[in-house]
Curated annotation (Swiss-Prot):
CC terms in the record's Gene Ontology section: cytoplasm; small ribosomal subunit
Molecular function GO labels: rRNA binding; structural constituent of ribosome; zinc ion binding
Presence of the UniProt keyword Transcription in the record: no
Bound cofactor: record note: Binds 1 zinc ion per subunit.
GO terms of biological process kind: translation
InterPro entries: Ribosomal_uS14, Ribosomal_uS14_bact, Ribosomal_uS14_CS, Ribosomal_uS14_sf
Organism: Streptomyces coelicolor (strain ATCC BAA-471 / A3(2) / M145)
Protein name: Small ribosomal subunit protein uS14B
PROSITE patterns per the UniProt record, alphabetical: RIBOSOMAL_S14 (PS00527)
Domain of life from the UniProt record: Bacteria
HAMAP family named in the record: Ribosomal_uS14_2_B
Pfam families: Ribosomal_S14
Length: 61
């Protein structure tokens, strides 16, 4: 329940712009969120492995 409240709180516009922060759109995780995708590293990795993110490939060198 607390996570839902924090997700709702993060969705509101803060009084001061610097207080805003990103959350994963899929799971609500507040840390390690990639702005380009709007996903945290965990969800990004899962979706990339399943091929749900177009243009994202596993790198090898």
């Amino acid at each position: 329940m607390a996570k839902k409240a924090l997700i709702a709180k993060a969705a509101r516009k803060p009084k001061f712009g610097v207080r805003g922060y990103t959350r994963c759109q899929r799971c609500g995780r507040p840390h390690s969120v990639y702005r380009k995708f709007g996903l945290c590293r965990v969800c990004l990795r899962e979706m990339a492995h399943r091929g749900e993110l177009p243009g994202v490939t596993k790198s090898s060198w």
